[in-house]
């Protein structure tokens, strides 16, 4: 294990082809990094020993990089040994991670999060700033985002807790589920379903080919709607006077699908803390 003195939140830059990355945030004024091989072969042991670690900067501008050596062959037919990064950093630190088939799990409170992966799953705690995640077949689960959320996936499912800022998301066969959206939503899918339990203001633009669309409208929000499905069904639980027939509206909904079903409903009331 390697320990670094980091009294302030830092930027954590990670690179790992295969394995697992576990990150926690804590109150301690230091960062700790432990690298272990997930296999007992010599190649895995040597790969763990050759991981590059470096702390750059000072004060509030520190950056800690942890990068595993590439284990791919000349034609990319063989991936590197599997390693595990176990990292602890101060609360509010930001993540910039690039992996191939490594899972990324972050618990605690982060500043911003940028994660690029191919087949690894991603789970994160609370993100105070923006969250940008790109995955091909990995699933994504984020507890909360206080900034903007920009997500893309091919076959992985996207699960988001409350998001205060704008949401931009695209999927092919993966599902998108959002607990609540505090601002505009722009979501595109092919066969995956799109569900936003609660949206109050801005613009909700959702398009799918065969995936179903479910949007919950927060209580009291006046809505303008443009909803259509060529061969699917459309259903709205909103009362006639709740639609924005004229005047000011809080939320503009444009939901379209080729064969998916579309449902608009009032969002469930938020329970008091």
Q: Which functions belong to the PLM regions below?
A:
Residues 1-273:
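Intrinsically disordered, low-complexity terminal regions
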């Amino acid at each position: 294990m390697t320990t670094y003195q980091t009294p302030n939140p830092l930027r954590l830059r990670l690179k790992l082809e295969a394995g697992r990355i576990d990150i926690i945030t804590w109150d301690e004024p230091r960062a700790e990094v432990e690298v272990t091989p997930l296999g007992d072969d010599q190649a895995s042991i040597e790969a763990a020993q050759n991981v590059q670690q470096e702390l750059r900067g000072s004060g509030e501008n520190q950056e800690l990089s942890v990068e595993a050596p590439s284990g791919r062959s000349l034609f990319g037919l063989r991936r590197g040994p599997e390693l595990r990064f176990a990292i602890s950093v101060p609360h509010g630190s930001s993540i910039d991670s690039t992996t191939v088939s490594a899972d990324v799990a972050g618990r605690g409170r982060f500043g911003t999060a940028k994660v690029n992966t191919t087949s690894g799953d991603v789970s994160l705690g609370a993100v105070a700033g923006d969250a940008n995640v790109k995955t091909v077949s990995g699933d994504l689960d984020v507890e909360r985002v206080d900034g903007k959320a920009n997500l893309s996936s091919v076959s992985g499912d996207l699960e988001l807790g409350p998001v205060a800022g704008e949401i931009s998301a695209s999927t092919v066969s993966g599902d998108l589920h959002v607990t609540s959206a505090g601002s505009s939503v722009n979501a595109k899918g092919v066969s995956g379903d799109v569900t936003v339990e609660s949206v109050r203001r801005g613009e909700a633009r959702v398009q799918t080919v065969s995936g179903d669309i479910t949007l919950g409208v927060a209580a009291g929000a006046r809505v303008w709607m443009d909803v259509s499905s060529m061969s699917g069904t459309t259903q709205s639980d909103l009362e006639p006077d709740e639609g924005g027939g004229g005047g000011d509206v809080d939320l503009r909904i444009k939901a379209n699908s080729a064969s998916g079903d579309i449902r608009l409903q009032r969002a469930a009331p938020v329970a008091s803390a």
